[in-house]
């Protein structure tokens, strides 16, 4: 069972994903410059990588698969070393790698939370999670691709504004789903008990 309701998660995800893009719509040049700095801004990379590593380790600690019970302490130490080691020895594109790992653990939460909500609209969250899984895998292996995508997306003010508008609209759509469809599905599940 997920620690958060899908309606709450959708509102949080929609706001966090959408609201920064208001800046991109209003001031595309400044927003584009900020985005172009992201792939090599190492302080953000430390935060993202360590937060994602801690979250992954928390997930591992809660895992109860008996096949891995004997290896769990070893795996815990190994993954902690990998997360910290990435911060120390793989600083090139560390923010991209940290974001990629964060997307992977966030996608797990999204899928786990959406699993039992009885509405087809949950597929919006599930598909979004799988997009993040694919992006997480791809950007972990080839983080320079995010730099290239950001450079393409911010090449002109018009493109930056348009893409920011699309992301803002999607974020608001997810918020709307959280306030309507997901909340209604959760209420009917409670009423049916």
Segments predicted by a language model, with ranges:
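N-terminal topogenic module of multi-pass integral membrane proteins
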Residues: 1-54, 191-192
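Helical transmembrane-bundle signal
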Residues: 14-24, 49-59, 80-83, 106-113, ...
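Juxtamembrane "helix-exit" motif on the non-cytosolic side of transmembrane helices
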Residues: 26-30, 58-64, 89-91, 112-118, ...
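Membrane-interface helix-boundary motifs at transmembrane edges
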Residues: 29-41, 64-69, 89-96, 151-154
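Membrane-proximal helix-loop-helix units in multi-pass membrane proteins
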Residues: 67-131, 135, 147
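Transmembrane alpha-helical segments of integral membrane proteins
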Residues: 136-151
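Interfacial loop-to-transmembrane junctions
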Residues: 147-165
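Juxtamembrane boundary at the C-terminal end of a transmembrane helix
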Residues: 173-193
């Amino acid at each position: 069972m997920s620690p958060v309701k899908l309606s709450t998660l959708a509102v949080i995800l929609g706001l966090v994903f959408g609201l920064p893009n208001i800046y991109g719509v209003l001031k595309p040049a400044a927003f584009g410059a900020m985005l172009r700095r992201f792939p090599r801004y190492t302080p953000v990379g430390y935060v993202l990588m360590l937060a994602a590593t801690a979250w992954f380790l928390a997930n591992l600690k809660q895992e109860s698969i008996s096949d891995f019970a004997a290896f769990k302490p070893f795996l815990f130490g190994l993954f902690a070393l990998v997360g910290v080691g990435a911060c120390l020895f793989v600083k090139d594109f560390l923010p991209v790698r940290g974001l990629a790992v964060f997307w992977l653990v966030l996608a797990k939460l999204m899928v786990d939370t959406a699993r039992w909500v009885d509405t087809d609209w949950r597929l919006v969250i599930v598909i979004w999670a799988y997009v993040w899984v694919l992006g997480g895998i791809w950007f972990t292996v080839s983080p320079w691709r995010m730099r290239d995508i950001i450079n393409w997306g911010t090449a002109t003010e018009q493109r930056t504004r348009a893409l920011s508008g699309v992301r803002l609209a999607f974020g608001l759509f997810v918020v709307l789903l959280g306030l309507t469809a997901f909340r209604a599905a959760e209420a009917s599940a409670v009423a049916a008990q």
